[in-house]
Amino acid sequence: MVNKNSPKTIDRIILGVDPGTNVMGYGLIAIKGTQLTLIQFGVIHLSKYTDHAIKLSKIFERISLLIEEYHPDEMAIEAPFFGSNVQSMLKLGRAQGVAIAAAISKQVPIFEYAPKKIKQSVTGSGNASKEQVAAMLSKILFFQEIPKLLDATDALGVAVCHYFQKGDVKKSKGGWNNFIKENPDKVKTVPAKISKKKTD
């Protein structure tokens, strides 16, 4: 597992966050040149807490712990989408705000991306499904088992989106087809399996 406390073998670490009030996803990737390496990804379970204030405190606590453990250089977070349920949107916005506050308290730069932008960056289509995003990420980051809760892969998608938006990889109008053609060593076909294991 990559760790910023180990000898300098990476350029930077990106923490991706998919905010939520019942399940919050997180994913960490390491960057070395143009090579992406998966560090860790998972979810923070919040549905067992009925008090919204407690949920927010748990989000702050867990994001802070992730930053302390992995020392990310940047945090990328998905922007809340606009829905018809005002109360749900308000709660989601609070969850995002608390995650951002945790990063600010640790002096980690924050970057925000819209859901469609993330899907476009990862798959080439802004209308891709969560399953399509997860499948593409499994090829980019070389993991075979896709977690049952796709909030984890959504968070990885935010981190990978940020990597591309920072200009680390030059992309032409060909999008992903062009990237795969120019970087065959970074993408290989790996059968993706849906894991039934409980995510911590």
Swiss-Prot record:
One matching Pfam family: RuvC
Cofactor binding remark: Binds 2 Mg(2+) ion per subunit.
Residues noted as binding Mg(2+) 1 in the record, renumbered to the chain: 18, 151
Cofactor(s), names only, from the UniProt record: Mg(2+)
GO terms assigned for molecular function: crossover junction DNA endonuclease activity; DNA binding; magnesium ion binding
Keywords, in A-Z order: Cytoplasm, DNA damage, DNA recombination, DNA repair, DNA-binding, Endonuclease, Hydrolase, Magnesium, Metal-binding, Nuclease
This enzyme's EC code(s): 3.1.21.10
Binding annotation for Mg(2+) 2: 78
A GO BP entry: DNA repair
Cystine crosslinks: none
GO cellular component: cytoplasm; Holliday junction resolvase complex
Domain of life: Bacteria
Catalytic site: 18, 78, 151
Top-level enzyme category: hydrolase
Gene3D superfamilies with a match to the protein in the record: Ribonuclease H-like superfamily/Ribonuclease H
Function per UniProt: The RuvA-RuvB-RuvC complex processes Holliday junction (HJ) DNA during genetic recombination and DNA repair. Endonuclease that resolves HJ intermediates. Cleaves cruciform DNA by making single-stranded nicks across the HJ at symmetrical positions within the homologous arms, yielding a 5'-phosphate and a 3'-hydroxyl group; requires a central core of homology in the junction. The consensus cleavage sequence is 5'-(A/T)TT(C/G)-3'. Cleavage occurs on the 3'-side of the TT dinucleotide at the point of strand exchange.
Homology family: Belongs to the RuvC family.
Self-association and partners: Homodimer which binds Holliday junction (HJ) DNA. The HJ becomes 2-fold symmetrical on binding to RuvC with unstacked arms; it has a different conformation from HJ DNA in complex with RuvA. In the full resolvosome a probable DNA-RuvA(4)-RuvB(12)-RuvC(2) complex forms which resolves the HJ.
Family matches, as NCBIfam families: ruvC
Name of the protein described by the UniProt record: Crossover junction endodeoxyribonuclease RuvC
Lineage start: Bacteria, Pseudomonadati, Bacteroidota, Cytophagia, Cytophagales
Gene: ruvC
